[in-house]
Amino acid sequence: MEFSKFIETAPEEIKDYLEKCRKTPQSPTWHPEGDVLKHTKIVFSRAAKTGDINYMFAAIFHDLGKTESTKLNKRGSWSSYGHEFISARLVIKHKDWISSQGADVDLVHDLVISHMKIKMMDEMRKPKQEEFKAKPNYEKIKEFSSFDNMKTLTPEELSL
């Protein structure tokens, strides 16, 4: 599935957020690909290869909150603290669109709200790690997180 085809049925608000993503910068340390829209297209492309509609929706929504939360930090780099919570609220707001396309809103919400937490596993205390690993969607969150990892960026993906 192509990104542009997938978002044809998206509510106008989501299309507006995606357009704002084009103008939302990211730290080149974590995102050598550039702006949030380019990143979203790469994550979507990786998710689409699985054929799992839930991953595709999570890819669309996971960083939309960066349009509202991105700021220069004290080190002069871009940070988007808490963007996953804004993004997760958008999933709930647009649950009718998500479910009308055959996706599981609860799973999409869990993938979106958890996509940053899984990256912090090593910093969690053991009991918190075990609690997170016990989540019913843990393996899916882990897989989705791999789509979001730009350390594995290919030249082909940069051209998306």
Model-predicted regions and their roles:
Residues 1-79:
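Acidic/His-rich, divalent-metal-binding segments that scaffold phosphate/diphosphate chemistry
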Residues 46-157:
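Divalent metal-dependent catalytic cores for phosphoryl transfer on phosphate-bearing substrates
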